[in-house]
């Protein structure tokens, strides 16, 4: 006979949600930091061709 599963407690639900929110906040912070570093020119791991380089390649 089928028996219903026990209900997940509110505290366990809240702990899981808090973990998820913490991970999401950390990921958002990393993305914001990366965006700022790209805009200020501090990023070392990216290569963006400048307009001068593109004009030299076309010539």
Curated annotation (Swiss-Prot):
Record GO terms (molecular function): structural constituent of ribosome
Highest taxon in the source lineage: Bacteria
Keyword flag Ribosomal protein: yes
Keyword Ribosomal protein among record annotations: yes
GO cellular component: large ribosomal subunit
Region listing for Disordered, in residue ranges: 1-26
Family assignment from sequence similarity: Belongs to the bacterial ribosomal protein bL32 family.
Full protein name: Large ribosomal subunit protein bL32
Organism field: Cyanothece sp. (strain PCC 7425 / ATCC 29141)
Taxonomic lineage from the root: Bacteria, Bacillati, Cyanobacteriota, Cyanophyceae, Gomontiellales
């Amino acid at each position: 006979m089928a028996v219903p599963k026990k209900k997940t407690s509110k505290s366990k639900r809240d702990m899981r949600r808090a973990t998820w929110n913490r991970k999401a906040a950390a990921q958002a912070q990393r993305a914001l930091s990366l965006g700022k570093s790209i805009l200020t020119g501090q990023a070392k791991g990216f290569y963006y061709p400048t307009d001068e380089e593109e004009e030299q390649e076309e010539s």
